[in-house]
């Protein structure tokens, strides 16, 4: 009987974590470059044979690899990645990966992220433009030109976010391992004048929310029923003694 209570409790803890991720996804449905979080659950078995009991794990988080849709802005400092890669920005937390390409040029000619951090090239150095020559023209390969002169290139990187990754700012991800620059850009490109929208599907997330809430309610009912049965058993044993 206690096993049922423990199983229900473990399921409830797992559902709470799923609720947290759904709430975060829904809150960022309109965040440029945001990648949704998912949770994978696994059964953990305690005991052996007929006495074995399966418990729900707390879950492992993962980052959705689905691409968000591209929206045209016409802003020459807006960039969207086409393919599997990330921009790199230099922050107080170290190098951060992001798909948010809303950049700008400061008075010193540095290409900056929406949050005011330097955007890095493929070598990991801040991108330096000439502030006197206006917005650059970007090639699909990320090359940047001013007055028809090559002045730099936007770095594109790949990395494994792993489990329990750390978010930074609006849509940044702090990599657990050093990201690798993309050297073969045949399947990866940059679109100037576009941004990538959040890849969160609000309708799908709300459907998941309803399902999780129902499962949570069913689990709570099971816990109440188990506790009630336990109380009845104790009373019965007490009356017999």
From Swiss-Prot:
PROSITE patterns: FLAGELLA_BB_ROD (PS00588)
Origin: domain of life: Bacteria
Keywords: Bacterial flagellum
Predominant location category: other
Gene Ontology annotations for the cellular component aspect, listed alphabetically: bacterial-type flagellum basal body, rod
Protein's cellular compartments: Bacterial flagellum basal body
Biological processes annotated in GO: bacterial-type flagellum-dependent swarming motility
Family, as annotated: Belongs to the flagella basal body rod proteins family.
Assembly description: The basal body constitutes a major portion of the flagellar organelle and consists of five rings (E,L,P,S, and M) mounted on a central rod. The rod consists of about 26 subunits of FlgG in the distal portion, and FlgB, FlgC and FlgF are thought to build up the proximal portion of the rod with about 6 subunits each.
Record protein name field: Flagellar basal-body rod protein FlgF
Lineage: Bacteria, Pseudomonadati, Pseudomonadota, Alphaproteobacteria, Hyphomicrobiales
């Amino acid at each position: 009987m206690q096993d049922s209570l423990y199983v229900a409790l473990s399921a409830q803890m797992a559902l709470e974590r799923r609720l947290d991720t759904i709430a975060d996804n829904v809150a960022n449905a309109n965040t440029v470059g945001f990648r949704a979080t998912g949770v994978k659950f696994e059964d953990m078995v305690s005991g052996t044979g007929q006495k074995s009991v399966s418990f729900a794990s707390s879950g492992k988080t993962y980052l959705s690899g689905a691409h968000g849709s591209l929206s045209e802005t016409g802003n020459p400092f807006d960039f969207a990645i086409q393919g599997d890669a990330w921009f790199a920005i230099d922050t107080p937390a170290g190098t951060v990966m992001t798909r948010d390409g809303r950049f700008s040029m400061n008075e010193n000619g540095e290409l900056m992220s929406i949050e005011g951090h330097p955007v890095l090239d493929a070598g990991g150095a801040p991108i330096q433009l000439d502030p006197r020559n206006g917005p650059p023209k970007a090639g699909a390969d990320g090359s940047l030109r001013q007055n028809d002169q090559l002045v730099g290139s936007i770095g594109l990187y790949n990395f494994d976010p792993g489990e329990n990754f750390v978010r930074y700012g609006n849509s940044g991800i702090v990599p657990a391992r050093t990201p690798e620059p993309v050297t073969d850009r045949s399947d990866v490109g940059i679109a100037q004048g576009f941004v990538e929208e959040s890849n969160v599907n609000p309708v799908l997330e709300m459907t998941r929310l309803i399902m999780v809430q129902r499962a949570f309610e069913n689990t709570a009912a099971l816990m109440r029923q188990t506790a009630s049965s336990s109380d009845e058993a104790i009373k019965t044993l007490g009356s017999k003694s």
